[in-house]
C-alpha cells in the first residue's frame, strides 16, 4: 500500500506546523463511514478508501508522536514512522472484528515509532533484549526526581515492569552515560533479540490512548445529537430542559421555573417529562 497510496507528507510540505494544520482539517469518520470504507478496502481492494482512512487518522499519529518528544528526535521523523505503522494497520484491519480502526492502529503506530527510536537514539545498543527495550521506554517516566534511583525505587520499578533489579540498574547506567555516541546496532548483532516492530509493542499502563479517543469522539457525537434534538423542541420546553439539566451553575427548581412562566410547578414537571421523552427518541434515532 505504501507504494500505491500517496498521503500527506511532512517532507513534501516542508513545514511541520503546516502539516499538522492540514492533517487536522481532515474530518473524522463516523462508525458507519469507517465500516463502509474498511469493507471497500478489504473486499474490493479500493485504494481510494484506503487513502481516506489514512488521511482521517493522521491526527492520531501526531498525537502519539508527542509522547516520544524526550528522545531528542525530530517530531517530523517520528510522525513519518508512525504513518508507516498507520498504513500497515489500515491494510491489515478486519472491519468484522467489532472495534474501531484507531484501537487496532495504535499498536502498529507505536511499534514503528519504537523501532525508529531504538535505532536512532544516542546510545549504542542501548536495548537489545525484550526486558531492556521495556526499560528503555518506561524508565524515565518512572523517575520521580533527578539523579540516580535509590535501592527502594529500583525494586519498585523492577516489580512494576517485571524485570530484575540488575536490569534496572544497568539500563539506568546506560541511559545516563553522556560520552557514548550513536551507532545503530547491526542486524547481525541482534540475532534472536532482533527488534520486530510487527510483533513487539510496549503497553503504557498509565493511559489507554485508543479508549480515550473513542470516548472523546463519542462525547462529541452525543453532544451534537443533543443539540440537534433540543432544536426540535418548542422554545418553552427547550428552556425548561436547559434550566433543569444543562445550566452549569445550578439546577433550577420546578417552582422557580413555574414562577418565571406564571404556571404551576406540576405543569412544569409535565412539560419537562414530555420534553425528555422527545429528546430520548430524537437521540436514539
UniProtKB/Swiss-Prot annotation:
The keyword Cytoplasm applies. Residues 53-122 are annotated as: Sigma-70 factor domain-2. Residues 229-281 are annotated as: Sigma-70 factor domain-4. Its main location: cytoplasm. One of its GO terms (biological process) is DNA-templated transcription initiation. One of its GO terms (molecular function) is DNA binding. It is found in: Cytoplasm. The keyword Phosphoprotein does not apply. Residues 254-273 bind DNA. PROSITE patterns: SIGMA70_1 (PS00715). Keywords: Cytoplasm, DNA-binding, Sigma factor, Stress response, Transcription, Transcription regulation. Signal peptide: none annotated. Coiled coil: none annotated. GO terms for cellular component: cytoplasm. A motif (Interaction with polymerase core subunit RpoC) lies at residues 77-80. Sigma factors are initiation factors that promote the attachment of RNA polymerase to specific initiation sites and are then released. This sigma factor is involved in regulation of expression of heat shock genes. Belongs to the sigma-70 factor family. RpoH subfamily. Interacts with the RNA polymerase core enzyme. This is RNA polymerase sigma factor RpoH. The gene is rpoH.
Amino acid at each position: 500500500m505504501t507504494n500505491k497510496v500517496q498521503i500527506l507528507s511532512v517532507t513534501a510540505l516542508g513545514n511541520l506546523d503546516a502539516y499538522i494544520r492540514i492533517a487536522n482539517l481532515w474530518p473524522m469518520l463516523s462508525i458507519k463511514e469507517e465500516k463502509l470504507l474498511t469493507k471497500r478496502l478489504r473486499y474490493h481492494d479500493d485504494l481510494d478508501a484506503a487513502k481516506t482512512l489514512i488521511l482521517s487518522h493522521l491526527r492520531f499519529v501526531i498525537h502519539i508522536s508527542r509522547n516520544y518528544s524526550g528522545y531528542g528526535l525530530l517530531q517530523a521523523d517520528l510522525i513519518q514512522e508512525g504513518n508507516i505503522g498507520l498504513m500497515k494497520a489500515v491494510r491489515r484491519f478486519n472491519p468484522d472484528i467489532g472495534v474501531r480502526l484507531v484501537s487496532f492502529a495504535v499498536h502498529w503506530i507505536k511499534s514503528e515509532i519504537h523501532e525508529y527510536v531504538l535505532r536512532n537514539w544516542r546510545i549504542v545498543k542501548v536495548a537489545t533484549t525484550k526486558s531492556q527495550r521495556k526499560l528503555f521506554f518506561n524508565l524515565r517516566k518512572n523517575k520521580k526526581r533527578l539523579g540516580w534511583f535509590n535501592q527502594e525505587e529500583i525494586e519498585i520499578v523492577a516489580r512494576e515492569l517485571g524485570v530484575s533489579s540488575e536490569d534496572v540498574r544497568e539500563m539506568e547506567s546506560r541511559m545516563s552515560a553522556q560520552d557514548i555516541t550513536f551507532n545503530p546496532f547491526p542486524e547481525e548483532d541482534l540475532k534472536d533479540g532482533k527488534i520486530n516492530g510487527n510483533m513487539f509493542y510496549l503497553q503504557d499502563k498509565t493511559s489507554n490512548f485508543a479508549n480515550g479517543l473513542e470516548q472523546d469522539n463519542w462525547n462529541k457525537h452525543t453532544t451534537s445529537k443533543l443539540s440537534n434534538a433540543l432544536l426540535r423542541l418548542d422554545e418553552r420546553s427547550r428552556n425548561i430542559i436547559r434550566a433543569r439539566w444543562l445550566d452549569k451553575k445550578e439546577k433550577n427548581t420546578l417552582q422557580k421555573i413555574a414562577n418565571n412562566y406564571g404556571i404551576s410547578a406540576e405543569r412544569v414537571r409535565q412539560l419537562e417529562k414530555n420534553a425528555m421523552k422527545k429528546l430520548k427518541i430524537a437521540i436514539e434515532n
